[in-house]
């Protein structure tokens, strides 16, 4: 009783009901592990017709090329859905450059495209105990490569590994905030 937060509307402090004032729509995302770009594209087109409006492709770094991206995204309208990608942390800049090149070739309005390229340096260190390259240099190159995609998120914090390792929710949140601060 007496809590003012129960009267808060979306878009109002303390943002308990989200930040969207006009609607509270969320993306429905499907993750696809890409074994072959043709099969992943067929699966993506099938699930897009079933209501999914966000795709997440886990691509193999060794196979990245302009043809690979073109085959993977064939007949998918990048302006109509959210596209998310993850690959080996050492190849995220290459992936970003290939995506920007593909989007420019298809004459998309780059300011309208939404999505992400998963670069989470700390998660790799936590999960594998290995550092892969220079974090600052890679992050800078990735941000520069995606500068023309203002609605693409490229620096991520994936705290799920902590949860899977047995962390409580408050520990997971605390570490995630600390990583974000780093």
Each model region followed by its residue ranges:
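Catalytic alpha/beta active-site cores
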Residues: 1-182
